[in-house]
A protein has these predicted regions:
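Sequence/structural signature of beta-propeller modules
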Residues: 1-32, 37-41, 349-365
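Aromatic (tryptophan-biased) beta-strands that constitute blades/sheets of beta-rich domains
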Residues: 1-20, 53-64, 97-105, 175-176, ...
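Loop-centered beta-sheet repeat module
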Residues: 5-10, 15-18, 161-229
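Repeated scaffold domains used in trafficking and secretory/extracellular systems
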Residues: 14-29, 59-78, 105-137, 179-194, ...
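Short beta-strand elements that form the blades of beta-propeller/WD-repeat-like
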Residues: 24-44, 73-90, 140-157, 194-206, ...
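Beta-propeller domains
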Residues: 33-58, 87, 91-95, 102-103
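Beta-propeller blade signature
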Residues: 159-172, 211-217, 256, 311-322, ...
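Loop/turn-rich, solvent-exposed surfaces of beta-rich toroidal or solenoidal domains
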Residues: 245-253, 267-320
Length: 365
């Protein structure tokens, strides 16, 4: 069975793909942004204005090249928050630094407390440092940051300790922190509609992939580990459910957000047919990206394992029973995984990374 998809719009990427990351959509309740990071700047487009044919962009100067960290943009586009090798920095579109919180160096062989990027800009080892990540909460009031200790001049913190911290987005004050008990090579945040909740997936190379779920109650940050070999993919529109995939990419799993308990799962080997051009070698497995179309519908892909055979395949999944509804049928071939675009939509990026395509199930406005 195939399920037709409708093209909502195609948006041109604002930066040259040769010197920038692929564009991505950040969405929060009532606000959707198309964000692209280059070496010298970050561009944030108002996605809904683009859909309506009214381009609206804000550009933020980058304090360091893209290989030295990650970035998030506030829902109101008043600041971009950069997670770097030695600091988390909030930058306004004018280039002014709103605040900076320094932390331990992400290069494991370095014990120095860096005061600027210039101190290691030309060092080969720091070019390949591990990294944390950062996210801005749904209402723009909180910044969530995964960093290496010590944080903001803390005394007595272990140099190899990693922290998950909640910061005041206005002034960078550290409001709360927890020890993640991880050894990251990289990490990624998964936002929740409630700004006091957030997910964190930590990649530890061959050691594992802990998935953490955090909650800020206004006084204290708490975090629970929902798995040691899981990647958080998405949160349902209601905020009640989490979607994960195991590090082997065998199964999509639906969890209760409140406590992380497993509700249902869908094994790719049992549900997804082999690619029509498959020669029988290799296995079918899920991508490490997926999206909730609505509370009861998930769109997921097998593009990574399909790549050797041709066009990517994407699938609609009934979240209520974690059962495959059918393969998504597009009006033209698409590439790569599916990612959430909010408002019942998902997006794909063209193979040359110059365009973003927004999709909805056919028949839905």
């Amino acid at each position: 069975m195939t399920v037709p998809a409708r093209l909502v719009t195609t948006i041109a990427a604002p930066l040259d793909p040769a010197s920038s990351e692929a564009p991505r959509v950040l969405h929060r309740p009532g606000r959707r942004l198309l964000v692209q990071r280059g070496d010298t700047e970050v561009v944030a487009l108002d996605l809904d204005a683009c859909v309506a044919g009214r381009a609206s962009e804000v550009r933020f100067p980058a304090p360091w090249p893209r290989r030295f960290g990650t970035v998030a943009v506030s829902p109101g586009r008043d600041a971009a928050v950069f997670a770097g090798v030695h600091a988390v920095r909030s930058v306004e579109a004018s280039g002014a630094t709103r605040w900076e919180v320094r932390h331990g160096c992400w290069y494991g062989g370095c014990s120095l407390a860096h005061s600027s990027f210039d101190e290691y800009a030309l060092d080969e080892d720091h070019r390949y440092a591990d990294s944390g990540s950062v996210a801005v909460g749904a209402d723009g009031g909180l910044v969530w940051a995964h960093v290496r200790a010590p944080l903001g001049g803390d005394a007595g913190a272990e140099g190899d300790q990693e922290l998950w911290a909640v910061l005041d987005a206005a002034d960078g004050r550290v409001l709360g922190r927890v020890d993640t008990m991880t050894a990251a090579s990289g990490s990624e945040h998964t936002p929740h509609p409630d700004p006091t909740r957030m997910g964190l997936s930590v990649g530890e190379g061959e050691e594992g992939s802990p998935a953490l779920w955090g909650r800020w109650d206004g006084q204290r940050l708490t975090a629970v580990q929902i798995g040691t070999e899981l990647v958080l993919l998405a949160v349902s529109p209601s905020g009640g459910h989490l979607l994960t995939v195991d590090v082997g990419q065998w199964s999509l799993s639906l969890h209760r957000a409140e406590d992380g308990s497993l509700l249902r799962e869908l094994d790719a080997r049992d549900a997804v047919p082999p690619h029509p051009r498959s020669t029988g070698e290799g296995r079918v497995y899920w991508d490490c990206d997926a999206a909730f179309v609505d509370q009861d519908t998930i769109v997921a892909g097998t593009s990574e394992c399909d790549a050797r055979y041709g066009a990517a395949r994407h699938w609609l999944v009934d979240a209520r029973g974690m059962a495959l509804r059918g393969e998504v049928s597009y009006p033209f071939p698409v590439s790569g995984p599916v990612r959430s675009a909010g408002d019942g939509a998902w997006y794909t990026v063209s193979e040359d990374r110059t365009s973003v395509h927004l999709w909805k199930p056919a028949g839905e406005n």
